[in-house]
């Protein structure tokens, strides 16, 4: 199924293909490859809820054509 990722920091929107049984951590790893942002620094939000890494797309209610908001959180390493 096709999932839309909306990057709030840049306004960029990307469509990727995943299976309903894929976990949120797979999406975060895909974002790491595309954007170079570590999964620990990513926050994915759907339907007003922060998505847990171990949840599947299906268990989060994500369907074909859904949009997931992507936020980046700076880790404490950036403050040093």
Curated annotation (Swiss-Prot):
GO terms for molecular function: protein tag activity; ubiquitin protein ligase binding. GO terms for cellular component: cytoplasm; nucleus. SMART domains: UBQ. InterPro entries: Ubiquitin-like_dom, Ubiquitin-like_domsf, Ubiquitin_dom, Ubiquitin_ubiquitin-like. Signal peptide: none annotated. GO terms for biological process: modification-dependent protein catabolic process; protein ubiquitination. It comes from the Eukaryota. Disulfide bonds: none annotated. Coiled coil: none annotated. Belongs to the ubiquitin family. This is Ubiquitin-like protein NEDD8-like protein 2. It comes from Dictyostelium discoideum (Social amoeba).
């Amino acid at each position: 199924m096709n999932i839309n990722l909306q990057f709030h920091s840049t306004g960029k929107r990307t469509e990727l293909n995943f299976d309903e049984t894929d976990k949120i951590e797979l999406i975060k790893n895909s974002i790491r490859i595309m954007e170079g942002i570590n999964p620990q620094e990513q926050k994915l939000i759907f339907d007003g809820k922060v998505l847990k890494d171990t949840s599947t797309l299906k268990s989060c209610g994500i369907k074909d054509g859904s949009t997931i908001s992507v936020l980046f959180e700076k880790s404490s390493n950036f403050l040093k």
